[in-house]
Amino acid sequence: MFDLDGTLVDTMGGFADIAAEVMAARHGVEWAWARGKYVETSGLPFCKQLEVVFPAHAANKAASDEFEARKLAVCDATSMDALTIEGLEALRGLGLKLVVSSNTGQTVVDAFVAREGFAFDLALGFDPAQGLGKGRPHVERALAVFGVSREELLFVGDSLKDADLADECGVRFIGRLGTFRDEDFRRRDPAAVFVPHVSELPALLERMMGADS
């Protein structure tokens, strides 16, 4: 299972800039401070990030709506790079099912998959009406669709919150460096496993599967 933004596509820098502009304008905080808070709480839907940073603030709903509208331009302009696609194809060659698990709205995730043309086995986004969201709802859906156990699932994400969600769901986690550094993941868990890029996952997983056999 792959997180989308910051893991499969390099959108986090653009998202962080937009989030900082929105919070600076609507909450009256410094741009640099707001950007740092966005990155720090990444891995949650932006509406929930705002509740962490500004609990029960009257501006949160409008700020969330503005961010979600403005981030679409970044989504539309950003594609998976060639190395990411190469890595995904190699993972499929190992017989693995490939799932997108994102807090971005389901319609945006569907548009991403259609635009990229890569045949993910399952693409899940944030859809409250369907009870879908990154974490337990997505894990339960994947378990049901593929008929596998939690021990057979692996979540790959770029944020510390992604690692928290994986732990809460009882699935293994591999960090994708970029949004956070190796020392950030190690500070959270000294035994953390991470890769600089998705393209390095196939070799790592081959070694892991060999060790498990």
What are the residue ranges of the model-derived segments?
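Short, acidic loop-to-helix structural element flanking the phosphoryl-transfer center
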Residues: 72-100, 106-114, 133-136
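Short acidic capping loops at alpha-helix termini that bridge into adjacent secondary structure
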Residues: 33-35, 120-122, 150-153
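A short, structured active-site edge motif that brings together acidic residues
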Residues: 37-38, 118-133
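Surface-exposed amphipathic alpha-helices with a cationic face
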Residues: 85-93, 143, 163-167
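N-terminal helical cap/lid subdomain that shapes the substrate entry/recognition surface
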Residues: 1-89, 93
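Acidic, Mg2+-coordinating phosphoryl-transfer loop and its flanking beta/alpha structural elements
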Residues: 154-194
